[in-house]
């Protein structure tokens, strides 16, 4: 993702503005990629509440509104770090995040490990994550543009795996069964346990564990 200096300046000047009004005034800024700028402005506005440490960092790139809504908050990412840190047995050298997304969980959890892998099948999210990890000096994180199941099948065993299944079906509707999430961790259980000493799974409280 490459933004021109004019677009970056527009983002800086309008980062607290109402994006609906900006969209209506797009014709006033012929040298600015207004749609791309609005994605960045909305992303930063969400991050100010959700991920304040990143919002305060100049140069962070943000994904679309849906990805920002779905990503972990700084508070919940730190909670996962505490889970890993409080686990007093086993090695903590290698870590793989199979559902990378915006990269919040991977960025925070990678601090616990010597080597980390961020896996994501959406190329745009990989590009954003690679930029942000470099900006944050997270040199221990490798970005992998790959399907999570295919990567899991091919990867070498690691100490920890993190996976956050999407609770949406192919039509964007919400699911209530673990088996309907993407990926289906119930079907991958044996392979996950074969590939990692510890597996940390984030599940929505809205899921019905009896299904």
Task: Tell me what each language-model feature is.
Residues 1-211:
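SAM-dependent transferase fold signal centered on methyltransferase-like domains
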